[in-house]
């Protein structure tokens, strides 16, 4: 059910943009990192439910999957993450900065 509230947030952003353009939304692109904690299948399921009777009701949802990338604090090696508590494959350290892949954001909105 967490994904439904995320859909509502995305729709709220698009509604505000649509009000400024006085148009309906034909497509919305959302980038979701693999560490964002979003179940993409659930998000895709809930999107049309949340968009019903809004300027996004007919909008196509496009999701861009973003692979998480981290940089090791010990050896500065950059590597892909599939889960949060992964150690550096170069030196074995667990200390890292996550460079990308932990966020969810509206990448673009296309109006009719």
UniProtKB/Swiss-Prot annotation:
Keyword vocabulary terms for this entry: Metal-binding, Nickel, Zinc
Role description: Involved in the maturation of [NiFe] hydrogenases. Required for nickel insertion into the metal center of the hydrogenase.
Protein name, entry field: Hydrogenase maturation factor HypA
The gene coding this protein: hypA
Gene3D superfamilies according to UniProt: 3.30.2320.80
Record GO biological process: protein maturation; protein modification process
Binding sites annotated in the UniProt record for Ni(2+): 2
Example of a GO MF term: zinc ion binding
Binding site for Zn(2+): 72, 75, 88, 91
Source organism phylogeny: Bacteria, Pseudomonadati, Pseudomonadota, Gammaproteobacteria, Thiotrichales
Top-level lineage group: Bacteria
């Amino acid at each position: 059910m967490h994904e439904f509230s995320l859909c509502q947030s995305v729709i709220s952003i698009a509604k505000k943009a649509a009000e400024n353009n006085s148009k309906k939304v034909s497509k919305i692109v959302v980038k979701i990192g693999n560490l964002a904690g979003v179940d993409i299948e659930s998000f895709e399921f809930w999107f049309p439910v949340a968009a019903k009777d809004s300027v996004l009701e007919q909008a196509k949802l496009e999701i861009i999957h973003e692979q998480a990338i981290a940089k090791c604090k010990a050896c500065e090696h950059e590597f892909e993450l599939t889960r949060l508590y992964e150690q550096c494959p170069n030196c074995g350290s667990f200390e890292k900065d996550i460079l990308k892949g932990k966020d969810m954001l509206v990448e673009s909105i296309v109006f009719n």
